[in-house]
Design a protein with these regions (language model features):
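Low-complexity, flexible helical/coil segments
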Residues: 121-127, 145-152, 176, 201-208, ...
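Charged/polar, solvent-exposed surface patches and flexible loops
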Residues: 100-103, 207, 249-253, 317, ...
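Secondary-structure transition/capping residues
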Residues: 31, 93-96, 258-262, 326, ...
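N-terminal Rossmann-like NAD(P) cofactor-binding subdomain of oxidoreductases
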Residues: 2-178
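Solvent-exposed amphipathic alpha-helical surface segments
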Residues: 27, 158, 212, 322-329
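C-terminal substrate-binding/catalytic lobe of Rossmann-fold NAD(P)-dependent oxidoreductases
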Residues: 18-73, 162-165, 169-170, 175-303
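NAD(P)-dependent Rossmann-like dehydrogenase/reductase catalytic/cofactor-binding core
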Residues: 244, 274-344
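Conserved active-site and cofactor/substrate-binding residues in soluble primary-metabolism enzymes
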Residues: 11, 15, 19, 80, ...
Length: 344
């Protein structure tokens, strides 16, 4: 029987959207994608080089409305013909678009990114995959939420069975290497949003684990630094029982995590630029394995967190599960084998 082919739309061509398009192009055959459509709000002269590069690879790029850019397909033209939507806008735009998507009876599914909480079931690859199978709308949690949840998962168990409590400090880079809008000139501390959980990172981890019926006693704080390279997280995890395996053994058995003996984020970032597809690192987090503090029932340390590479991998996984892609486990294993590394 011939496998179904999908027409997909990437709505938003910022950092996440364009990086996602590159992944979809690379794995177009494996994901059974017939056509990739994309929507961009505006077309400036200095952006046309990249647009033309993507168009040369077969991506059909339209605009948000028929009147905004002449002679280009609009979102209105594309919505009736696509099977799946990768919502890559931010700052509440995706939540506004959800109202339209919910009226599309033919639409198999859609996913949105970290800032669009409430778009659907909060999701991260390797954590709650069973909860989004055949779900129409999924919210892929942020890159730093990925990092925090992955550390809890590897050291305390998939259901957090060995977690007593945890505290994490997220050290954020201020802006992607290719942008400048959100750069800061000095360290900026984030406001705690919850008197117990702290910043949105722990709130989002807690809410994601609620989809599994699991309580997550996690607190987080957040500081943004004048860096454009990688995030980092300092973790302090209190265990119910001491680890029965070494951290190295645990991480080796968790394909979404990686290790490094390097202390400089710029060195790790440069390796990703050289050897990662699209110059990116896709692990949920990279643990500084030679710098852990372990005492009885406590494990403390640092991990680097890639920018949006980890969320892109979860976004691809969400698509597979939402549309019930044929042989999705085998396809995802191939993608993970291609993109993930044991050490950096």
């Amino acid at each position: 029987m011939e496998k179904k082919k999908y027409k997909v739309l990437v709505n938003g061509m910022g950092n996440i959207g364009t990086s996602l398009i590159h992944l979809l192009l690379r794995y177009k055959n494996e994901l059974h994608i017939e056509q990739i459509y994309a929507v961009k709000r505006s077309f400036k002269d200095w952006q046309m080089t990249e647009i033309e590069m993507l168009q040369a690879q077969g991506v059909i790029i339209g605009t948000t409305s028929r009147s905004s850019v002449p002679n280009r397909p609009s979102l209105e033209d594309q919505l009736p013909i696509v099977d799946y939507i990768f919502e890559a806008t931010a700052n509440g735009v995706g939540l506004e678009n959800l109202n339209t998507y919910q009226t599309l009876d033919h639409l198999l599914g859609a996913s949105a990114q970290g800032s669009e909480k409430g778009f659907g079931t909060s999701f991260m690859a390797g954590i709650n995959e069973e909860k989004i199978k055949n779900q129409r709308f999924v919210h892929v949690v942020s890159c730093n939420t990925h990092g925090s949840a992955a550390l809890l998962n590897v050291f305390t168990g998939k259901g957090l069975e060995n977690l007593q409590s945890a505290d994490m400090v997220v050290v954020r880079r201020s802006e992607d290497i290719g942008n400048h809008q959100r750069l800061v000139s000095a360290n900026v501390v984030a406001r705690h949003l919850d008197p117990i959980a702290g910043t949105h990172h722990s709130i989002d981890v807690i809410d994601m684990y609620k989809t599994l019926g699991v309580e997550c006693p996690l607190t987080s704080s957040d500081i943004t630094t004048p860096s454009q390279l990688m995030h980092a997280v300092r973790f302090n995890i209190q265990l119910k029982e001491a680890l029965s395996e070494t951290p190295e053994e645990l991480i080796k058995n968790q394909p979404f995590l990686s290790m490094t003996k390097k202390f400089d984020s710029n060195v790790v970032f440069e390796l990703g630029r050289r050897y990662g597809f699209g110059g990116r690192i896709y692990e949920h987090a990279i643990v500084l394995i030679s710098n852990l503090l372990i005492s009885n029932k406590t494990i403390k340390g640092w991990a680097f967190v890639p920018q949006e590479g980890n969320t892109l991998l979860s976004t691809i996984r969400a698509f597979m599960l939402q549309v019930s892609l044929t042989d999705h486990d085998a396809v995802f294993l191939k993608i993970k084998t291609d993109l993930l590394k044991e050490q950096w």
